[in-house]
Protein backbone atom coordinates (compact mmCIF):
# COMPACT_ATOMS: atom_id res chain seq x y z
CA UNK A 1 0.00 0.00 0.00
CA UNK A 2 2.91 2.36 0.72
CA UNK A 3 4.32 1.84 -2.75
CA UNK A 4 0.96 2.79 -4.27
CA UNK A 5 0.83 6.03 -2.25
CA UNK A 6 4.42 6.73 -3.27
CA UNK A 7 3.63 6.28 -6.94
CA UNK A 8 0.58 8.55 -6.58
CA UNK A 9 2.81 11.16 -4.97
CA UNK A 10 5.36 10.95 -7.80
CA UNK A 11 2.73 11.17 -10.55
CA UNK A 12 0.92 14.08 -8.91
CA UNK A 13 4.19 15.93 -8.18
CA UNK A 14 5.27 15.45 -11.80
CA UNK A 15 1.97 16.84 -13.09
CA UNK A 16 2.29 19.74 -10.63
CA UNK A 17 5.83 20.44 -11.85
CA UNK A 18 4.63 20.52 -15.45
CA UNK A 19 1.77 22.85 -14.48
CA UNK A 20 4.12 25.19 -12.65
CA UNK A 21 6.52 25.16 -15.60
CA UNK A 22 3.72 26.02 -18.00
CA UNK A 23 2.47 28.84 -15.78
CA UNK A 24 5.98 30.22 -15.24
CA UNK A 25 6.60 30.38 -18.98
CA UNK A 26 3.32 32.20 -19.66
CA UNK A 27 2.95 34.55 -16.68
CA UNK A 28 5.01 37.75 -16.46
CA UNK A 29 8.34 37.27 -14.66
CA UNK A 30 8.34 37.99 -10.94
CA UNK A 31 10.98 40.67 -11.56
CA UNK A 32 8.04 42.68 -12.94
CA UNK A 33 6.16 42.25 -9.69
CA UNK A 34 3.13 44.44 -10.44
CA UNK A 35 2.55 42.78 -13.82
CA UNK A 36 2.86 39.39 -12.17
CA UNK A 37 0.39 40.30 -9.40
CA UNK A 38 -2.03 41.78 -11.94
CA UNK A 39 -1.91 38.55 -13.97
CA UNK A 40 -2.61 36.51 -10.84
CA UNK A 41 -5.51 38.74 -9.81
CA UNK A 42 -7.01 38.54 -13.32
CA UNK A 43 -7.19 34.78 -12.65
CA UNK A 44 -6.78 33.88 -16.29
CA UNK A 45 -5.86 30.44 -17.57
CA UNK A 46 -2.18 30.82 -16.64
CA UNK A 47 -3.01 31.80 -13.04
CA UNK A 48 -5.45 28.90 -12.74
CA UNK A 49 -2.83 26.47 -14.01
CA UNK A 50 -0.39 27.89 -11.44
CA UNK A 51 -2.99 27.32 -8.71
CA UNK A 52 -3.58 23.76 -9.93
CA UNK A 53 0.16 23.13 -9.75
CA UNK A 54 0.32 24.42 -6.19
CA UNK A 55 -2.70 22.33 -5.19
CA UNK A 56 -1.06 19.35 -6.88
CA UNK A 57 2.00 19.79 -4.69
CA UNK A 58 -0.23 19.90 -1.63
CA UNK A 59 -1.99 16.68 -2.65
CA UNK A 60 1.39 15.11 -3.39
CA UNK A 61 2.57 15.92 0.14
CA UNK A 62 -0.53 14.19 1.54
CA UNK A 63 0.27 11.09 -0.54
CA UNK A 64 3.91 11.28 0.55
CA UNK A 65 2.83 11.38 4.19
CA UNK A 66 0.76 8.22 3.63
CA UNK A 67 3.76 6.64 1.86
CA UNK A 68 6.05 7.20 4.82
CA UNK A 69 3.61 5.43 7.13
CA UNK A 70 3.82 2.24 5.10
CA UNK A 71 7.19 2.21 3.32
CA UNK A 72 10.75 2.48 4.61
CA UNK A 73 12.25 5.92 4.00
CA UNK A 74 15.20 4.39 2.14
CA UNK A 75 12.83 2.95 -0.46
CA UNK A 76 10.30 5.77 -0.43
CA UNK A 77 12.90 8.45 -1.06
CA UNK A 78 14.24 6.59 -4.07
CA UNK A 79 10.79 6.77 -5.66
CA UNK A 80 11.08 10.55 -5.90
CA UNK A 81 13.69 10.16 -8.62
CA UNK A 82 10.98 8.79 -10.91
CA UNK A 83 9.59 12.32 -11.09
CA UNK A 84 12.68 13.40 -13.06
CA UNK A 85 12.04 10.62 -15.55
CA UNK A 86 8.34 11.41 -15.93
CA UNK A 87 8.88 15.15 -16.40
CA UNK A 88 11.68 14.54 -18.93
CA UNK A 89 9.48 12.20 -20.99
CA UNK A 90 6.45 14.50 -20.73
CA UNK A 91 8.51 17.50 -21.86
CA UNK A 92 9.37 15.66 -25.06
CA UNK A 93 5.92 14.20 -25.70
CA UNK A 94 3.58 17.06 -24.78
CA UNK A 95 3.14 19.75 -27.42
CA UNK A 96 4.68 23.13 -26.71
CA UNK A 97 7.26 21.96 -24.20
CA UNK A 98 10.19 21.73 -26.60
CA UNK A 99 11.94 19.08 -24.54
CA UNK A 100 14.92 17.68 -26.37
CA UNK A 101 16.16 14.13 -26.53
CA UNK A 102 19.82 13.41 -25.94
CA UNK A 103 21.73 10.22 -25.38
CA UNK A 104 23.26 11.76 -22.26
CA UNK A 105 19.80 12.36 -20.78
CA UNK A 106 18.70 8.86 -21.78
CA UNK A 107 21.75 7.43 -20.01
CA UNK A 108 20.83 9.43 -16.90
CA UNK A 109 17.27 8.06 -17.05
CA UNK A 110 18.63 4.53 -17.47
CA UNK A 111 20.82 5.04 -14.38
CA UNK A 112 17.83 6.28 -12.37
CA UNK A 113 15.68 3.33 -13.42
CA UNK A 114 18.51 0.84 -12.77
CA UNK A 115 19.02 2.30 -9.31
CA UNK A 116 15.32 2.02 -8.55
CA UNK A 117 15.27 -1.61 -9.66
CA UNK A 118 18.26 -2.38 -7.44
CA UNK A 119 16.69 -0.69 -4.44
CA UNK A 120 13.36 -2.46 -4.90
CA UNK A 121 14.76 -5.93 -5.61
CA UNK A 122 13.42 -8.39 -3.07
CA UNK A 123 16.01 -9.12 -0.43
CA UNK A 124 17.04 -12.67 0.23
CA UNK A 125 18.16 -13.69 3.67
CA UNK A 126 21.70 -14.98 3.69
CA UNK A 127 22.62 -17.91 5.88
CA UNK A 128 26.00 -17.92 7.53
UniProtKB/Swiss-Prot annotation:
A GO cellular component annotation in the UniProt record: plasma membrane
Function summary: Translocates 4-amino-4-deoxy-L-arabinose-phosphoundecaprenol (alpha-L-Ara4N-phosphoundecaprenol) from the cytoplasmic to the periplasmic side of the inner membrane.
Statement: the UniProt record of this protein carries the keyword Zinc: no
PANTHER family (alphabetical): 4-AMINO-4-DEOXY-L-ARABINOSE-PHOSPHOUNDECAPRENOL FLIPPASE SUBUNIT ARNF-RELATED, SMR FAMILY PROTON-DEPENDENT DRUG EFFLUX TRANSPORTER SUGE
Transmembrane segments: 3-23, 36-56, 77-97, 101-121
Origin superkingdom: Bacteria
Gene that specifies this protein: arnF
Organism expressing this protein natively: Escherichia coli O1:K1 / APEC
Positions in the Cytoplasmic compartment: 1-2, 57-76, 122-128
Gene Ontology terms describing biological process: lipid A biosynthetic process; lipopolysaccharide biosynthetic process
Primary location group: membrane
Alphabetized InterPro entries for the sequence: Flippase_ArnF (IPR022832), Small_drug/metabolite_transptr (IPR000390)
Cysteine pairs bridged by disulfides in the record: none
Protein name in the entry: Probable 4-amino-4-deoxy-L-arabinose-phosphoundecaprenol flippase subunit ArnF
Record-level Gene Ontology MF annotations: carbohydrate derivative transmembrane transporter activity
Amino acid sequence: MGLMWGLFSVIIASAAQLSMGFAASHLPPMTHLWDFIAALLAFGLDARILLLGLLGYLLSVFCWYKTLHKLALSKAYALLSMSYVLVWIASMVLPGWEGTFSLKALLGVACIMSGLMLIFLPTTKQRY
